[in-house]
């Protein structure tokens, strides 16, 4: 996977955290910069660890299903993208976004909940020739940036963007999945 695809993937994976941090920022009267940085760090670290875990799981299984790797990566990205679009399209506000408490453990649990898709992406990346450390670092850094920004601007754009950030992220993931499939089919032709 080239640098531009890695960056697109990293920012697509950060959309869940961005949407969650917008909700958290919107729930505070005036989020402080320190609170935004803390939120970004928690989300970023967890989001960087989960694709590594997924990659290890996928690497173990990859020796058994190498000939199906592109279909697996496409399927995971497509399913996760559709899930993100569906979640973004829901009109209900989730309980995690309603909470006013921003304790360490609340942030950790929210970060874990928003990073499970990154673990599944890690499984899919095990079937591709990628540098997982660089990819995980890019995902973590993008998530840290987006979660921090989401906290700071959440009170301003929360009502305007909110869950649409997840829809955008889902569309990007589906696009990456189709790109992986296209590249594989093009190589066979």
From Swiss-Prot:
The keyword Ubl conjugation does not apply. Keywords: Cell inner membrane, Cell membrane, Ion transport, Manganese, Membrane, Transmembrane, Transmembrane helix, Transport. It is found in: Cell inner membrane. The chain crosses the membrane at residues 3-23, 41-61, 65-85, 104-124, 132-152, 165-185. InterPro entries: Mntp/YtaF, Put_MntP. Its main location: membrane. One of its GO terms (cellular component) is plasma membrane. It is a multi-pass membrane protein. Pfam families: Mntp (PF02659). The keyword Ion transport applies. GO terms for molecular function: manganese ion transmembrane transporter activity. Probably functions as a manganese efflux pump. Belongs to the MntP (TC 9.B.29) family. This is Putative manganese efflux pump MntP. It comes from Yersinia enterocolitica serotype O:8 / biotype 1B (strain NCTC 13174 / 8081). The gene is mntP.
